[in-house]
Curated annotation (Swiss-Prot):
InterPro entries assigned: Peptidase_S8/S53_dom, Peptidase_S8/S53_dom_sf, Peptidase_S8_Ser-AS, Peptidase_S8_subtilisin-like, Peptidase_S8_subtilisin-rel, TPP_II_domain, TPPII_C_sf, TPPII_GBD
Catalyzed reaction equations: Release of an N-terminal tripeptide from a polypeptide
Entry keyword set: Aminopeptidase, Hydrolase, Protease, Serine protease
Composition-biased stretches (Low complexity): 64-81
Identification of the protein by name: Tripeptidyl-peptidase 2
Gene expressing this chain: TPP2
A molecular-function term among this protein's GO annotations: tripeptidyl-peptidase activity
Gene Ontology CC entries for this record: cytosol
The keyword Transmembrane is annotated on this UniProt entry: no
Species in which this protein is naturally found: Oryza sativa subsp. japonica
Amino acid sequence: MWHLRGRSSVTAAAAAALHKPVAHLRLLLAVSAWSVPAAASNVAAASTTTRGGPSPSAGVAPRAMPSSSSSPPSAAEGTTAAAGGFRLTEPSFLESLMPKKEIGVDRFLAAHPEYDGRGALIAIFDSGVDPAAAGLQTTSDGKPKILDVIDCTGSGDVDTSKVVKADDDGSIVGASGTHLTINPSWKNPSQEWHVGCKLVYELFTDTLTSRLKKERKKKWDEHNQEAISEALKQLNEFEKKHSKSDDAKQKMAREDLQSRLEYLRKQAEGYDDRGPVIDIVAWHDGDVWRVAVDTQGLEGNKNCGKLADFVPLTNYRLERKFGIFSKLDACSFVANIYDDGNLVSIVTDCSPHATHVAGIAAAFHPDEPLLNGVAPGAQLISCKIGDTRLGSMETGTGLVRALIAAVEHKCDLINMSYGEPTLLPDYGRFIDLASEVVDKHRIIFISSAGNNGPALNTVGAPGGTSSSIIGVGAYVSPAMAAGAHCVVQAPAEGMEYTWSSRGPTADGDLGVSISAPGGAVAPVPTWTLQSRMLMNGTSMSSPSACGGVALLVSAMKAEGIPLSPYTVRKAIENTAASISDVPEEKLTTGHGLLQVDRAFEYAQQAKELPLVSYRISINQVGKPTSKLRGIYLRGSNTCRQTSEWTVQLDPKFHEDASNMEQLVPFEECLQLHSTDSSVIKIPEYIMVTNNGRTFNIVVNPVNISSGLHYYEVYGIDCKAPWRGPIFRVPITVIKPIALSGEPPALTLSNLSFKSGHIERRFINVPIGASWVEVTMRTSAFDTPRRFFLDTVQICPLKRPIKWEAVVTFSSPSLKNFSFPVEGGLTLELSIAQFWSSGIASHEPTCVDFEIVFHGISVDQKIIGLDGSEAPVRVVARSLLASERLVPVATLNKVKTPYRPVESNLCSLPPSRDRLPSGKQIIALTLTYKFKLEDGAEIKPRVPLLNNRIYDNKFESQYYRISDSNKCVYSSGDVYPNYVKLSKGEYTLQLYIRHDNVQLLEKLKQLVLFIERKLEKKDFIQLSFYSEPDGPTVGNGTFKSSILVPGEPEAFYVGPPSREKLPKNVLPGSVLVGSITYGAVSSFSKKDDQNQHAPASYSISYLIPPSKVDNDKEKGVSSGRKSISERLDDEVRDTKIKFLSGFNQETEDDKSSWTALVASLKPEYPKYTPLLAKILECIVQKATSDDKFSHQKEIIAAADEVVDSIDKEDLAKSLSLKPDPEDEEAQKNKKKMEETRDQLADALYQKGLALAEIESLKTDESTEASAKDVFEENYKELIKWVDAKTTKYGSLTVLRERRCGRLGTALKVLNDMIQDDSEQPKKRLYDLKIQLIEEIGWVHVSAYEKQWMHVRFPPSLPPF
């Protein structure tokens, strides 16, 4: 998975740029020893196979084409070569930091300096652009650079629906509870102030938060060390004064001082800064909505960050003003107000990525023009699609709102340097809406192709897989290598970065449209504390291309050339400079390297042509295949015979095209060409009208060699051949190698690698293979070498099966690998030496590579144990060679299904959530409740929706997990995460959006699974048997066997024993895990910690119904009590239980409850359970009026409970140890324990009431008397229970507090809080803050108050 498609240097700021980097771990692994960025994600490589005739590649048309060259312009212009090396001058060095020559920008601007992007508006769909960053304030002609800054995800939303009014001195109480002073100069005719608050770290990136935490902890540690020193001084002084005292009071005083010191030391160890709270205030000044922010908590200085000192902001688009939270963070933000002041969006970036992207596209540096972006005259809007709550992951909500904003602002271009893998190309809700934006609103959409190279089929969505979006690959020139990457010796020629994703798509489309420079030193946000940074990736090539297209837009607008995404795309593709003469390299580079000047010449010449694009859909004749966008033959079977394909060619006009003036007269005569007539057969001419035309293609790959082959069928306008290909049908043929031997193996000897070289092999994986063991040996080189190893297999309706490794060889050596494969599918093996690895060495790397296929086939890949005692029979075979059958099955997770307890549909406010078509987006909120009996790591899963963002017809999915205190523990989207939760009850809310209410209605009972990890000690290892009765009888254990090729071996998988099942698992839950069958061969065991074969399969066990307890009714002697007596007991207990049914909120309820109590007491005098229930109800009764009388009532009720109990008899009974076999004695003991608990609870409640009365009284004499009663009551309590436990600890805390032993009180209270058997109680934390303030630890009090907003927020945040 990736989403940000850029890489950065190995610095703290760089880490922020790539918080959830492009693909897996390659960002971290692919950093070149001397090249800052060489961080790549998934692997993909340039093709080395060369087959097929000449292609109408970029810039080289089969007929007259606009002036172009077959190779990119020399990147060495302005440099000097010495001894075969590459040297930079100072100007060319600066140029290399922001590459533009490579795409012809220098030539274009030299001819048209006024067409530098002026008049072009670009929407940046990314992580949020910093409006304070260098080069992003104005355009080259003095206009504002950034016209709007929008958080489309909602991650910065603050609920400001609470309205307050100022008091007489001009102060209000903010949402955080802080008293805020209003600036008297602020106009507010209504005098209504909307207030909200937010933890400021929720607005910051992890990198910025980490820096702030370090800075703030330094200051906090200083204060804490002072407090520790003072506490230690007090303890030492006490020890000197009372060193030999054995007095109990002196001992307790000493313990108190020791507790204070211990508490401070533990605070330092457990310090976790969750950040201060900022208060947000919004109001309407009579003209517009305004926002002010109070950041005193962040400043750390009472004189800074005050609300009244803040310069009010309004929606950014109105005044284009931004704020800075504090000097410490240097983080800028903007504000947008929605829903009549009830919602304020505080917009910050979630990564430096977007600012860097925006700088490449359009930065303007008047003092250093060489560092300008590609289109310094262009203007921008920032659409934040990366959600800060999710680390910077894009969300469906963010993507759709961004499209809405782009249309609303009438943008000319969109740049999106984000993406994900997909199982279906050109499919999904966002793809549909993006196509509408392009086709109807004429916005040019440009996106990154992905960083998953060097293997083929690695382009991601949406850039590399969507017909309406221009996907851009990443190119590195010699100048970029020498300057931006600072390599010791630049390569002689430019090349595609090793990690740049390659095509084709699963449905045969080319995947990569064009290439552009994929690295730059560009602006980054101010909070990084630097002005610019080096990043590379297709994230950088996309804005480079987008900036180049913005120049075209600027020129076309200025010269009155009709602007259309169709025309622009044809211009840039047909004039791109070829990077390689090898046809197969088109899958790597697309049509070539963008050339702005030539594209403009093309656009000028094509200005009178119809604004039309040809859409292609292809079907194989005789097969009911889905509509394809290319022909893709991948496998030995498809290459053994000739195939015929029907191509449907449909002209696509913009939606506002006139029927009579454009559609009816449209007619084009096209001559068809193929790049290799020996393989591809086509008609010679076709006539195309508005309703389209079909023609057939015959592909005969029978006689071609093994490997990769790429061909094209393209049409040329007979009347205007200079236009180049009007449409192209990409044809990719992969003919794999068939292996032999036992086991099947492929040996590649003496492969020679230099920097950037890629070797590809395509292998027909034998049926029956399930894993591969690889040996890679290197030799004959000097400096360390880094290699990317990738394998890819394509499965229908599934993301590509991909394995990858990044390996560094410090010296000649051998490495072993093993990974799973799917039998019967073609496997691509890519071995690539990283583009900058060994670049200064003249010695090639010699590589020997051996790949051996192994496999154990089973008759059922997914095993489901149904919860019964019966085992499951499995039949295993080895089809390739002898293998050792060693089954291992482990159940390590439990999945519990839940249905929503509540579902709610609501129409969202139109300010952000109305589509350009006018359709209103609707939200479905599903509420689930679940309970954990013990702490656990859990992950919510929604099988219908998870793991699909672009290839999903539902717009958005977002969940959050909270407790009864409204504390949010976790949130997530399409890729749920594990979160560690304590014991307790939790609420999960799932938020789904769409404009079709009928679709949402179908999801109202959507099943969600809570997946819980088992602790390692609780993993369940299943047993195997050679007999069907083995699990029951306990014999016939199966351990291992040798499989002879073709001969089946059967065994049974037994269910887990009842004793091994996890506790507190609900029936209907499913234990899940994995099972493996084979073992890797001995040569690779040294490298593999786990010697089991890497091919694993799913296994599950359904939790059966609970055991029926037949012992419940045993021991009930019919002769002990008569039926009449038992009936009386039942009636009595029901009446007592009924007491809890009164809420006592109304006078009628109170009088009814009192009457019931009055009737029950005489009927059941001295019956302790009744009196205990009465006490419980009185304690729970609301007391807003007379608190003193209420406490007196509690004391009276508690005394009645105490008086009802014979304490001597109780003590005697509890001291006796009953006979464990005497059932009656055991029941009596349990009854006595219940009575003891009722006594203790009465004493506890009485003590709390006495303390409360004491706090309400002011008369000293009564206070002294109350102290005696309190102490007497407390001493009675500790006779029966440990008063320091969680249940009774509050009274101990009050007692220690009354005695002035605040340290001891704090210790007891902290122990209560840390007991995770219950969820946090606000009253305990409030008491904790009171104790800390009484001690005088200001810094600890401030810390705890900040945590209160985390544990007990006033409300759940908006979605």
